[in-house]
Amino acid sequence: AEVDRVLTATGSRWGQLDTIGEQEHRGIARRMYKAYPDLFAEGTVRAVSSYSPRSIMSMYSFTHELAQQSSAISVETASGRQFNTLVRNFDIDEEYKAYRNDTAYAGAYGRYLAQNLTVEPLLRLVGENYELDYETISDLALAEYYVAAGMNAMGLEFDASKYFTLEEYKRLWSIFNFRQYLLY
């Protein structure tokens, strides 16, 4: 039922910037303007984006709000692959690519996963009679958390306590965040 709600709410718009994302970027611009008004007293704001439509819309939401905050500035925007070296450094930075290809971090992640993974929420959802290997069950347990965490981020009302205890949620959150920290 929850997955159906996600599919209905997203309406095949995977990867597009939604109104929540637009609001977040406008909010960042407003806070930046209020924190550093002298920076925007006059002059030109130049913004660049990669070729990704979501990235372009993020840039436009941000710069549009800056222009709304101060009529004394002019705004110039540009997007395209020519800016990849600036905004997609993870694709071109050779040291980072070598780190991602070197699986040295996998040991630390594997140990942390083994110590903190909780599969009880998943087993409560699908039942205990499924014969799944450890890798599959850990992937599914994290996917269950990821869907749950994403519901609120998408503005969909979601009560995680129907699926997770607070301790289970914290443990899955910590695994997901540790992975993000190691990889990104």
Can you name each region flagged by the protein language model?
Residues 1-44, 52-184:
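Signature for phosphate-centric chemistry
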